Amino acid sequence: MNETLYCSFCKKPESRDPKKRRIIFASNLNKDVCVCEYCIDVMHGELHKYDSKYDRMDSLLALKRDRLRRMESSAYEEEFLLSRIPAPKELKAVLDNYVIGQEQAKKVFSVAVYNHYKRLSFKEKLKKQDNQDSDLELEHLEEVELSKSNILLIGPTGSGKTLMAQTLAKHLDIPIAISDATSLTEAGYVGEDVENILTRLLQASDWNVQKAQKGIVFIDEIDKISRLSEHRSITRDVSGEGVQQALLKIVEGSLVNIPPKGGRKHPEGNFIQIDTSDILFICAGAFDGLAEIIKKRTTQNVLGFTQEKMSKKEQEAILHLVQTHDLVTYGLIPELIGRLPVLSTLDSISLEAMVDILQKPKNALIKQYQQLFKMDEVDLIFEEEAIKEIAKLALERKTGARGLRAIIEDFCLDIMFDLPKLKGSEVRITKDCVLKQAEPLIIAKTHSKILP
């Protein structure tokens, strides 16, 4: 028999090296069974551990349950291995459907995600080739250790940082956990432990450890845990440098013990162990004041330099010149910055982009509200001037695209309250509805007149 044999229990292949894994093949009642020597040793030990046949039966059932768990785990790995990883252009095209503008950031993000999961796919191929003779090319590739491409996103609130991560995670069918760094504290203090981030990822993975270990962790407001100076603090900093040190452990890749089902840690309790080596970490923040640090560095040798307030365009342009030392000066520890090698900046949203965000993406807010009204057989129309005023209001509030829903909810609340009564009508949102809280125009289609 020339084909490679696989153990029917642990699913491991037979080694061509006689000193390694050997497999016994048996055919009985038209059913082929293969058992490796390691599984035979395990079963032999379990069967002789008990005296009664009932204890032996319980032991065999336990072995079967353990085998099913391992099969489920390996099935996910196999599924991930065989699934085609979309090219960066395909990933960017997906982002284009939901994120307006930010072209450079979307390119950087797509390439980083592609390289990360290509790395995981390669690692799984190496596992599958374990105990088998590989070709010269594979042996050459084994000598190269591929590092993780964790990402640091710098951009104002509502510019699309979180949305990009959520969009690709959904497209790739990968679990994602989103956390706010401002709520994190060092272990032992009031607040949220860093390990709770991984608990959220496990919950998003339906407590499937293998699936969680290939997921995405998004940590927002990372700039809010910066230390106050470049020099190491001699006092206890439970929500700044201390949290950065705790994050460093899980971001760089380590085995972390998580309480089962999100419970609290107990010295004698059981733990779920997660390897963070293959989890993609994305950290993001607005980094207010970083532009001034970069400007000071880039203009320090210019005679007659005076501190002048920069315009928005100048701030966006200078942020693209950010270097590691600027982030250290801002308050991030060098070790953490080193674990976030992919850096991208996002621009603030312009008025034109905000108008497009309201209308063009697949999940555009205007499309969502029109669909909600259509469920009650009511047509919702937004006039162009009204859309512009909504965009202007969001820019004035400095909430980015995130604040658009609150603005629309404000003037649509009363009309949605009476929506079931307006079946067969048309509701028109005008400029005055946004600026002066005027009532929307309600037009009865059948009578073609404005209702009081």
Curated annotation (Swiss-Prot):
Classification via Gene3D superfamilies: 1.10.8.60, P-loop containing nucleotide triphosphate hydrolases (3.40.50.300)
Xref: InterPro entries: AAA+_ATPase, ATP-dep_Clp_protease_ClpX, ATPase_AAA_core, Clp_ATPase_C, Clp_protease_ATP-bd_su_ClpX, ClpX_bact, P-loop_NTPase, Znf_CppX_C4
Organism of this sequence: Helicobacter pylori (strain J99 / ATCC 700824)
GO biological process, one term: cell division
The protein, known as: ATP-dependent Clp protease ATP-binding subunit ClpX
Molecular function via GO: ATP binding; ATP hydrolysis activity; ATP-dependent protein folding chaperone; protein dimerization activity; unfolded protein binding; zinc ion binding
Cited PROSITE patterns: CLPX_ZB
CDD domains linked to this entry: RecA-like_ClpX (cd19497)
Physiological role: ATP-dependent specificity component of the Clp protease. It directs the protease to specific substrates. Can perform chaperone functions in the absence of ClpP.
